């Protein structure tokens, strides 16, 4: 087993997903490397908005929870191949103005030393539900 994959299992990714559903940024960040990168599904660049390092990434996740106070990722499925992996999910959330969102998406991961080094998010672009 490669050193970069050590301790990364489907259970590890489920624990990461559980931390997101609990909106527990401390637990979320414990799954990520100190030099982690989060590439959001939207943003000004071709790869979405990029956040680097524990502080920036944590703030980005906190912003998701502030934007969608009831954010939830359901029906997760996790896959690992070497130092890469991905999770599929259905995201639901309601903005403060009442706009509801329900979309499928996935996260592509790169692992390093048993943690998530890169979380690259993708999701469908669906019109808001009325």
What are these model-predicted stretches?
Residues 37, 99, 115-117:
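Residue-level signal for well-ordered, solvent-exposed loop/turn and beta-edge residues enriched
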Residues 104-127:
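Short beta-strand edge/turn micro-motifs at domain boundaries
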Residues 93-102:
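Short, cysteine-centered beta-strand-loop-beta hairpins and adjacent loop/turn segments enriched
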Residues 82-91:
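A short hydrophobic beta-strand element
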Residues 32, 91-93, 123:
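Short beta-strand segments enriched in hydrophobic/aromatic residues
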Residues 72-73, 88, 101-107:
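Short, surface-exposed coil-to-beta transition loops
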Residues 6, 27-77:
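A solvent-exposed, acidic/Ser-Thr-rich amphipathic alpha-helical stretch
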Residues 3-6, 10-35:
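Short acidic-aromatic low-complexity motifs
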């Amino acid at each position: 087993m490669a050193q970069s994959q050590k301790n990364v299992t489907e259970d590890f990714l489920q624990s990461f997903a559980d931390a997101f559903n609990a909106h527990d940024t401390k637990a979320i960040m414990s799954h990520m490397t100190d030099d982690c990168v989060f590439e959001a599904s939207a943003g000004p660049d071709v790869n979405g908005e990029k956040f680097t390092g524990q502080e920036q990434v944590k703030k980005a996740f906190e912003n998701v929870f502030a934007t969608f106070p009831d954010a939830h990722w359901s029906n997760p499925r996790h896959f690992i191949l070497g130092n890469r992996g991905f999770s599929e999910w259905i995201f639901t959330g309601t903005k403060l103005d009442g706009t509801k969102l329900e979309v499928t998406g996935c996260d592509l991961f790169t692992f390093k030393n048993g943690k998530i080094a890169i979380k690259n998010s993708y999701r469908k672009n669906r019109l808001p539900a009325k």
